[in-house]
């Protein structure tokens, strides 16, 4: 049984966007505004540096009951005791990640098309990240935008909890939630916001209102 998790407002970090403010400060301000889950995504960091970032984030997040998900790096997630890992289509198979991390780990998987869904082993997966809904500049290999319609189509084929991702801003949140999302994953909408806490509060309010 995985750690409890809430996909409502899911922050995916980008060190390029948090350089001026700092990673820890950005995440702390985002959590103050209502972020419910944090993914550490830093593809440029080597293993040791990534582990140091992860340990610092765990120290910040765990006392607040917010899980830390590591992007791609199952080895780092295991080494630092992070709550979970998020895998892309070209990463380690979810079953292998589950075998390494154990039954309590949260395992997420990116899916952007019906073809990817058909090729995916969802058995060990706890949630699906679906997108990119909009064009995005924060992930070069994200693929073409699928739009709200594409998200809704995949939602109709996936029973697992789903989070929408990809170039999402506050004005997109209501439509994504109404298309069946369990939450919204954002990068620049928070990491590049002048006031991270206020931006998170705005998103969280829209998400909660859209559920009613």
Curated annotation (Swiss-Prot):
GO terms for molecular function: magnesium ion binding; thiamine-phosphate diphosphorylase activity. Pathway: Cofactor biosynthesis; thiamine diphosphate biosynthesis; thiamine phosphate from 4-amino-2-methyl-5-diphosphomethylpyrimidine and 4-methyl-5-(2-phosphoethyl)-thiazole: step 1/1. Binds 1 Mg(2+) ion per subunit. This is Thiamine-phosphate synthase. It catalyses: 2-[(2R,5Z)-2-carboxy-4-methylthiazol-5(2H)-ylidene]ethyl phosphate + 4-amino-2-methyl-5-(diphosphooxymethyl)pyrimidine + 2 H(+) = thiamine phosphate + CO2 + diphosphate; 2-(2-carboxy-4-methylthiazol-5-yl)ethyl phosphate + 4-amino-2-methyl-5-(diphosphooxymethyl)pyrimidine + 2 H(+) = thiamine phosphate + CO2 + diphosphate; 4-methyl-5-(2-phosphooxyethyl)-thiazole + 4-amino-2-methyl-5-(diphosphooxymethyl)pyrimidine + H(+) = thiamine phosphate + diphosphate. The lineage of its organism: Bacteria, Pseudomonadati, Pseudomonadota, Alphaproteobacteria, Hyphomicrobiales. Its cofactor is Mg(2+). Condenses 4-methyl-5-(beta-hydroxyethyl)thiazole monophosphate (THZ-P) and 2-methyl-4-amino-5-hydroxymethyl pyrimidine pyrophosphate (HMP-PP) to form thiamine monophosphate (TMP). 2-[(2R,5Z)-2-carboxy-4-methylthiazol-5(2H)-ylidene]ethyl phosphate binds at residues 136-138, 167, 187-188. It is an enzyme of class 2 (transferase). Belongs to the thiamine-phosphate synthase family. GO terms for biological process: thiamine biosynthetic process; thiamine diphosphate biosynthetic process. 4-amino-2-methyl-5-(diphosphooxymethyl)pyrimidine binds at residues 39-41, 71, 110, 139.
